[in-house]
Amino acid sequence: GLKKPLIAMNQGKIRNLRVVADFNDDMQNVQGVITQYNEGNIEDCMVTGTISGYMGGNGAVVYPEFGGIAGENALAGIIFGCTSKLNVNLTMAPMKSWVGGIAGLNIGTISKCVSTGTIRVTQTNGNEYPVYVGGIAGEIQKFGGMGGVLKECLHAGKITVTAANNCVG
């Protein structure tokens, strides 16, 4: 299976892609199976497989984010009709972090997506740092009053978070 994100930055259109992932490594910053950052369209894609390891970041500007499809779905990003069947087991650095079945952090639009995998996240020694974990997205944010859309999605898997300051959805 795929060992690293397929694409660093998507600004185009990715469609009808099937990816089997086998990430088992220490990862830094933002990670997703298909793309680290999405500013384009990702449609009708499916990811399966296993993700495990330790995630860190520089803690100043870039924090650890993991998503089954995209690590971060930016304001212009659209993820539509995608499925994640991943088994995720990550240990996060003691800093603010995000993990989601489809996107770690969603500032754009995610619609008609399904996540059925297992998400297990552990963070130790990070009492003051929030860990945002969700079946579809770890966190949804608006930017300048725009974006941050999640509609007609389903998570039918299991989520387990072991952290002192966690937010689970």
Label the model's feature ranges.
Residues 1-169:
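Predominantly extracellular beta-rich ligand-binding scaffolds that present long acidic/polar faces
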